[in-house]
């Protein structure tokens, strides 16, 4: 609501009404995101990133058939496309697999759900604050709506897991607390998501709790850098987030005597969370 108040004198976004209009929006969103990441020093852009994003640009969907995510994308695909950080990670794992054979393949359960969903959800808002929508203030409203939907979805799933609500009642929370009634347009997505998260306790909430952990990690990392008298750079943070683990450093820590080990700076729990490498093939959701 505060974002809408800020933008009250601006014209509203207009949804794409034809394949040509959607394709133009999607192409513009990809170009805008990649330019932003590269020119604003957000992250070192690998050759695999733009092709990975282009492979998931989507296509025009008639208004009466759009579910929540594609409703937002037909106004501006960029907020949803930033969540596609997932595809950047999967492309990187294809070209730079984890050195440990134990962590190269898919696990029976995606224990990294908080890491990957939290990061994908977190960068949506981080990129907004870093200036991605400075030339399209109304698009900021979509970022908040996407986050509100994840929060409503996760809250409903918590009630269901606690046996305080049926899945249908949890879905009602999901619908009622998503802004603009955009979860009431297409019931298949609602049923699918509530069923998915009912079967995986903690997954539905991981989008929001994982986002918090990413933000906490950013704060912890920035403080560590500044305490060393160095200048914080956002690109360094995301590059380290994307980097494979330094196995030699970890090995040295394990082999060092106890007294020497104390000389290493303590790594916060959130930093450890963020620096996990996600195994290839894990399930990734919007």
Residues of each region from the PLM?
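Long, His/Glu/Asp-enriched segments that create or flank divalent metal/ion-associated functional microenvironments
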Residues: 1-286
């Amino acid at each position: 609501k505060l974002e809408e108040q800020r933008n009250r004198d601006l014209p509203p976004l207009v949804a794409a009404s034809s394949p040509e209009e959607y394709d133009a929006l999607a192409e513009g969103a990809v170009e805008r995101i990649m330019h932003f990441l590269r020119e604003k020093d957000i992250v070192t852009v690998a050759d695999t990133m733009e092709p990975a994003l282009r492979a998931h640009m989507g296509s025009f969907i008639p208004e009466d058939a759009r579910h929540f995510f594609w409703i937002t994308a037909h106004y501006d695909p960029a907020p949803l496309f930033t969540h596609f950080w997932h595809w950047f990670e999967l492309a990187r794992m294809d070209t730079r697999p984890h050195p440990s054979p134990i962590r190269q393949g898919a696990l029976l359960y995606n224990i990294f759900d908080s890491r990957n969903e939290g990061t994908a959800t977190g960068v949506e808002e981080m990129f907004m604050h870093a200036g991605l929508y400075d030339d399209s203030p109304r698009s900021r409203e979509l970022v908040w709506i996407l986050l509100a939907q994840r929060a409503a979805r996760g809250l409903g799933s918590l009630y269901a897991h606690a046996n305080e609500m049926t899945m249908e009642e949890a879905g009602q929370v999901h619908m009622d607390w998503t802004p603009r009634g955009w979860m009431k347009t297409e019931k298949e997505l609602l049923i699918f998501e509530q069923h998915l998260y009912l079967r995986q306790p903690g997954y539905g909430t991981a989008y929001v709790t994982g986002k918090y952990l990413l933000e906490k990690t950013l704060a912890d990392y920035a403080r560590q850098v500044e305490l060393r008298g160095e200048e914080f750079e956002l690109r360094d943070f995301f590059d380290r987030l994307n980097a494979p683990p330094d196995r030699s450093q970890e090995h040295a820590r394990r082999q060092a005597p106890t007294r020497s080990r104390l000389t290493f700076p303590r790594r916060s729990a959130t930093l450890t969370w963020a620096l996990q490498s996600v195994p290839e093939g894990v399930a990734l959701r919007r």
